[in-house]
């Protein structure tokens, strides 16, 4: 299915791609807004050998999943901004308890700089003093840690966004400040299992990310967002290969694909172009392959330079690491 799509819709570089890894894949970062749409579109994931999926939910809809698919999914619950900012520590901790009682073992925070725009414009709540390390959130971290849950966090965005979107810095803050803010949480809660979305938001800062891995043994990352990973990995190919070799046990593969309205109008292109981008990036030695979907932040155009990772590393990031990481919960 996927190769037929490539031949009919994509440039020749994506046809009959060499495949190093032939085993099952675990997509460790997706979003489900419509669970029945996710069921309907599961065949596209299966075409890329995806057998397990971690899906982030905004509502308690896991129970609506068809019984025969229960073993295919692990679910996380999104902690909504309105609830996070209730200013009632007991309420926030109780919310974690509620999610836990419903069977959720992963709690997601979305704390990228755009968050402050949403909170101020939609919720009409000033956020000048709100940080990840604010005492306001301590009850949440403590409860997550005590219950042995996983904290999934997106705390930052690509460097290019800070240069072009997040201006002035006086309003949004710097990327380094945001990374330091999350590190304070890691320091205070060393036993909390933390999954940093999108390579911990640090594919551009491998030295700092490596230091985090060396310092915080319960910190892991997913390599989700084909656009972001392809752009940044390709620009520092040699360094990222060495990084994967050194930290292959701490990296999970994911896509950040959403089963929602975006996935209704351009099917199966939405899925297959991202999957094949990862295949070129991780499994081949192809160089200078044009990214098959837009990258608005990179005006010069993004080309994918394959890392040609060895099978041992691919086995870990595609499957073994996620199985081991999520088995803890």
Locate predicted features.
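Acidic (Asp/Glu)-rich catalytic clusters
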Residues: 17-19, 42-47, 62-74, 94-104, ...
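Distinct, well-ordered alpha-helical segments
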Residues: 38-39, 65-66, 88, 96, ...
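N-terminal/domain-start segments enriched in small and hydrophobic, helix-friendly residues
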Residues: 46-51, 137-173, 177-193, 206-219, ...
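Active-site gating/metal-coordination segments in enzymes
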Residues: 59-165, 171-173, 220, 225
């Amino acid at each position: 299915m996927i190769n037929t799509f490539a031949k009919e819709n994509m440039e020749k570089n994506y046809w009959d791609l060499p495949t190093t890894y032939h085993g099952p894949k675990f997509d460790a970062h997706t979003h489900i807004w419509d669970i029945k749409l996710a069921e309907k579109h599961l065949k596209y994931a299966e075409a890329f050998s995806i057998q397990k999926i971690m899906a982030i939910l905004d509502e308690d809809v896991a129970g609506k999943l068809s019984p025969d698919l229960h073993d295919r999914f692990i679910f996380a619950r999104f902690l909504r901004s309105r609830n996070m900012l209730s200013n009632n520590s007991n309420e926030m901790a109780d919310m974690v308890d509620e999610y836990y009682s419903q069977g959720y073992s992963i709690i997601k925070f979305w704390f990228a700089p755009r968050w402050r725009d949403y909170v101020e414009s939609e919720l009409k709540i000033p956020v000048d003093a709100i940080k990840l390390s604010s005492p306001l959130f301590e009850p949440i971290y403590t409860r997550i840690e005590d219950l042995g849950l996983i904290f999934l966090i997106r705390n930052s965005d690509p460097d290019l966004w800070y240069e072009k979107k997040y201006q002035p810095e006086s309003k949004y803050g710097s990327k380094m400040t945001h990374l330091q803010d999350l590190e304070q949480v890691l320091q205070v809660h060393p036993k909390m299992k933390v999954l940093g979305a999108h390579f911990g938001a640090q594919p551009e800062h491998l030295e700092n990310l490596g230091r985090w891995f060396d310092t915080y043994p319960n910190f892991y990352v997913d390599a989700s967002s084909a656009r972001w990973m392809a752009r940044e990995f390709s620009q520092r190919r040699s360094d990222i290969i060495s990084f994967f070799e050194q930290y292959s046990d701490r990296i999970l593969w994911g896509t950040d694909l959403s089963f929602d309205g975006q996935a209704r109008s351009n099917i199966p292109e939405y899925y297959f172009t991202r999957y094949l981008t990862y295949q070129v990036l991780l499994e081949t030695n192809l160089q200078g392959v044009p990214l098959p979907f837009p990258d608005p932040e990179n005006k010069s155009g993004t080309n994918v330079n394959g890392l040609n990772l060895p099978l041992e590393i691919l086995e870990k990031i595609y499957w073994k690491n996620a199985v081991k990481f999520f088995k803890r919960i």
